[in-house]
Structure formats: structure tokens, C-alpha cells
């Protein structure tokens, strides 16, 4: 089966930070989950596969209802390092950040079958990129969550690197955040 023939699926663990933050701010989470045809009960099984498009529709519904345009960043920031226990195991046996990133590129499709993380570079620089086409180009939350998640992975492995450049493909949905990326990266 070609990858383009597969239904895009994502683990419940990826949606959970969005649910937690939405719940904290008083969003009617269960109602919004039902409205996009996702299970309305708490997703106890982090490995449960969910339709990815429905998950992003849920997140978009929270953004529209609560008027929080950077909700994807807030949710990604809500994921603390202890919550990244599954990712922390990536660092075992790796001698450097490059090894961690290589391993992540291999295991990322276990969390979403729409992921295509790659490493490109020269002898002096490495670019860590998400090459898969976003399911919904006009949903900024997808881009914001992915970029901050990638930053957090680097921080998990290195603490705070001496330098890190951040960028993404400019689309109308995310250009509003590009003027000052430091303003949304601050924790």
C-alpha cells in the first residue's frame, strides 16, 4: 500500500497536551471532541490511534472558540520533560545530538503515520526538518506544534544548545507568528 493511500493516524499521546490545556482554560472539551467525531471520554491509552485530521479539527475548534491563535505553542509548552518519557529513551546509547535526531527520524512514524522527519546537512551544519505535507495547510496550529516539538526534542538531548536557528515554510496561516519568533518561544 502506498503511503498516500493510508488514512492519516496519530497517537492519542500527541493529542493529550491539547486536551489538557483546553480543559485547564475551561473549554467544553468533551463536546468539541464529539463534534469532530473523536471519543469524548478521556483517552487513557496513549498508544491509541486516532484519525489525525479529526484531531487537528478539534484543535482548530478550540482556537476558534477560545480566540487563542497560538494554542499549538501553548500546548507544546505544556508538555514538560517528565511527560516526554517515551522520547527520553531516545537518548540512551546515543553519543551526540545527531544520533538522537537520527533515531527520532526513524521512530516518529510510530506516533503519526504522516510524519517524515529528515536530517540534511553539510560537514558543519545539520538541518532537522519535517518534510511531510501538512494535512491542513491553513491550520497554523499544526506548524506551530511541530516546530516547538522539534525544538523541545533538541533541548531534551542537549539542555540548551549554544545556537539553534528556527524556521518554517511561510504560509498565510503562520506568517502572523513569524515577525518575532522569540516572542512565542519564551517559556
Predicted region positions:
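Alpha-helical bundle regulatory/interaction domains
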Residues: 94-187
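N-terminal low-complexity or simple alpha-helical regulatory segments
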Residues: 1-127, 163, 174
Amino acid at each position: 500500500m502506498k503511503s498516500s493511500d493510508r488514512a492519516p493516524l496519530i497517537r492519542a499521546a500527541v493529542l493529550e497536551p491539547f486536551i489538557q490545556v483546553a480543559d485547564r482554560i475551561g473549554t467544553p472539551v468533551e463536546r468539541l471532541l464529539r463534534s469532530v467525531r473523536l471519543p469524548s471520554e478521556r483517552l487513557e491509552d496513549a498508544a491509541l490511534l486516532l484519525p489525525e485530521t479529526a484531531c487537528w479539527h478539534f484543535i482548530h475548534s478550540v482556537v476558534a472558540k477560545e480566540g487563542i491563535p497560538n494554542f499549538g505553542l501553548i500546548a507544546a509548552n505544556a508538555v514538560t520533560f517528565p511527560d516526554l518519557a517515551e522520547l527520553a529513551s531516545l537518548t540512551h546509547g546515543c553519543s551526540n545530538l545527531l544520533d538522537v535526531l537520527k533515531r527520532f527520524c526513524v521512530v516518529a512514524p510510530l506516533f503519526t503515520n504522516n510524519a517524515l522527519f529528515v536530517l540534511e546537512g553539510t560537514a558543519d551544519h545539520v538541518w532537522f526538518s519535517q518534510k511531510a505535507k501538512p494535512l491542513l495547510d491553513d491550520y497554523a496550529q499544526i506548524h506551530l506544534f511541530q516546530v516547538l516539538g522539534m525544538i523541545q526534542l533538541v533541548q531534551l538531548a542537549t539542555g540548551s544548545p549554544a545556537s539553534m536557528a528556527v524556521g518554517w515554510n511561510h504560509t498565510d496561516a503562520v506568517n502572523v507568528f513569524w515577525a518575532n519568533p522569540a516572542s512565542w518561544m519564551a517559556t
